[in-house]
């Protein structure tokens, strides 16, 4: 695979107004993508976004670039990332474009693409788009220019799709659910899905103003949700991130239920109903408690690199259907082609309803190990993890933790940091082991 100049693992992302998140680059990106994609069928591309104010600017620039290449743009407005994957398939579009920076603050944004089947673009297509970005723009003949249209019923279509994944003979009637949409793309979707399935819904984070996305709300900051769940006597709280591809949950006591616990609940229910289709893919950061709990059920488990892209790659490689991260990216491949926060939350709610059990009871089956994370800054170019002294200390710690814990040492890809993670059933032992490794890293 050629080295990427513009595309990262999740499209193009950065600070608005700074390259590459500028209107002129978005125009060129729309044109380059259009030139590559225009060689195929419908010549229509879906464009969705989250609620950031910069989305207006970027969608207009992308649309102009696509039109110059002869492709038409269909705008769906603010919609969750997984909704664009679904709608791209159902509209039989050439591709879907999502304008979002996920859980980042409003001043960041990004652009990523889905293929016609709602999956990440193949590497060779991204590479072809990159190659064109360095070429001068041209424009098709006037009669071949693309058009723009707005799809007004996109939200309703996706709401119905989400509801259709919930068991037909089940209902959320009698449940009180607090839904936190991070002032992001799920603000007009998730509350309606839960209401139409019968739940009493309390909304927070559903008043986006273009600037308040992910601000003290949503999956990355659940304190407000925890407070409302406890004060209102709700059964459960759901927190989505800005683009709706991840989920965190809160039980009736205000306890956080993270991606590892959610993944286990879904896996166990799939096993019970005969729909698991293989094993579960986690990541290097998945808690060892998840691995142990799955082992007790004889469910195969493997770890991918951190990032939902790598989880998806492993799922496809193994032919499995379920994977995710502790950050709340949960992929249920027999429901959607990408991580989907609303679908994942409905899977857990269906398990609660089927067994008449609280989220607290379901999550208790995954006793998460205490996890100690320490970032160590280092000077100079040499990676301390290559030091024999650090390797010796790490090997000694691994020996002591054998069977009851693990360590993960990683060099940051963006900063001069070594990330030290130790987890163990014994929290005090995890802390002392982490400190021992940190001292070795600092000394080398």
Curated annotation (Swiss-Prot):
Question: What EC class is this?
Answer: isomerase
- Report the cofactors: Mg(2+)
Q: Does the keyword Ligase apply?
A: no
Q: Which reaction does it catalyse?
A: alpha-D-glucosamine 1-phosphate = D-glucosamine 6-phosphate
Catalytic machinery residues: 102
Pfam families hit by this protein: PGM_PMM_I (PF02878), PGM_PMM_II (PF02879), PGM_PMM_III (PF02880), PGM_PMM_IV (PF00408)
Q: Which biological processes are named by the entry's GO terms? A: carbohydrate metabolic process; peptidoglycan biosynthetic process; UDP-N-acetylglucosamine biosynthetic process
Output the CDD domains linked to this UniProt entry.
GlmM
Modification Phosphoserine, positions: 102
Quote the PTM field.
Answer: Activated by phosphorylation.
Keyword Isomerase present in the record's keywords: the answer is: yes
Q: What is its EC number?
A: 5.4.2.10
Q: Which UniProt keywords apply?
A: Isomerase, Magnesium, Metal-binding, Phosphoprotein
According to the record, cofactor stoichiometry and binding are noted as: Binds 1 Mg(2+) ion per subunit.
Binding sites annotated in the UniProt record for Mg(2+): 102, 241, 243, 245
Give me the Gene Ontology terms describing cellular component: cytosol
Q: Name one GO molecular function term.
A: magnesium ion binding
The free-text function statement in the UniProt record for this protein reads: Catalyzes the conversion of glucosamine-6-phosphate to glucosamine-1-phosphate.
Q: Which NCBIfam families match?
A: glmM, PRK10887.1
Q: Which family does it belong to?
A: Belongs to the phosphohexose mutase family.
Q: Which HAMAP family match?
A: GlmM_B
Name of the protein in its database record: Phosphoglucosamine mutase
Query: Per the UniProt entry, what species is this protein from, by scientific name?
Result: Actinobacillus pleuropneumoniae serotype 5b (strain L20)
């Amino acid at each position: 695979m050629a080295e990427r100049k513009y595309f990262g693992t999740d499209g193009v992302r950065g600070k608005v107004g700074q390259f590459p998140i500028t209107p002129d680059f978005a125009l060129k990106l729309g044109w380059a993508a259009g030139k590559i994609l225009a060689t195929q069928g419908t010549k229509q591309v879906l464009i969705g976004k989250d609620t950031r104010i910069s989305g207006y600017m970027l969608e207009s620039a992308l649309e102009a670039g696509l039109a110059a290449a002869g492709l038409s743009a269909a705008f769906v407005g603010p919609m969750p990332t997984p909704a664009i994957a679904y709608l791209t398939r159902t509209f039989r579009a050439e591709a879907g474009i999502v304008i979002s920076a996920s859980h980042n603050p409003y001043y960041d944004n990004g652009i990523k693409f889905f293929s016609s089947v709602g999956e990440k673009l193949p590497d060779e297509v991204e590479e072809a788009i990159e190659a064109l970005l360095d070429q001068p723009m041209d424009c098709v003949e006037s009669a071949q220019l693309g058009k723009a249209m707005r799809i007004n019923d996109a939200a309703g279509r996706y709401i119905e799709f989400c509801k259709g994944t919930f068991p037909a003979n089940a209902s959320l009637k009698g449940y009180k659910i607090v839904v936190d949409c991070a002032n992001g793309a799920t603000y007009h979707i998730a509350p309606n899905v839960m209401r139409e399935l019968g739940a009493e819904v309390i909304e927070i984070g559903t008043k986006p103003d273009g600037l308040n996305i992910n601000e003290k709300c949503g999956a990355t900051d659940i304190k407000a949700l925890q407070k409302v769940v406890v004060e209102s006597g709700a059964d459960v709280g759901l927190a989505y991130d800005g683009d709706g591809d991840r989920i965190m949950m809160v039980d009736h006591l205000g306890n956080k239920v993270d991606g590892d616990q959610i993944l286990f609940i879904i896996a166990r229910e799939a096993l019970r109903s005969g729909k698991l289709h293989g094993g579960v893919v986690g990541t290097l950061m998945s808690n060892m408690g998840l691995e142990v709990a799955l082992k007790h059920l004889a469910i195969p488990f493997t770890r991918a690199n951190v990032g939902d892209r790598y989880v998806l790659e492993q799922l496809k490689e193994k032919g499995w259907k379920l994977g995710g991260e502790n950050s709340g990216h949960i992929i249920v491949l027999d429901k959607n082609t990408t991580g989907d926060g609303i679908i994942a939350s409905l899977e857990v709610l269906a398990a609660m309803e089927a067994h008449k059990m609280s989220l607290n009871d379901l999550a208790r089956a995954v006793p998460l190990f205490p996890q100690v994370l320490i970032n160590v800054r280092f000077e100079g170019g040499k990676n301390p993890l290559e030091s024999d002294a650090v390797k010796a200390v790490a090997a000694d710690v691994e020996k002591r933790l054998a069977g009851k814990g693990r360590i993960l040492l990683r060099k940051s890809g963006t900063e001069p940091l070594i990330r030290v993670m130790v987890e163990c059933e014994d929290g005090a032992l995890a802390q002392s082991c982490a400190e021992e490794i940190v001292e070795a890293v600092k000394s080398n």
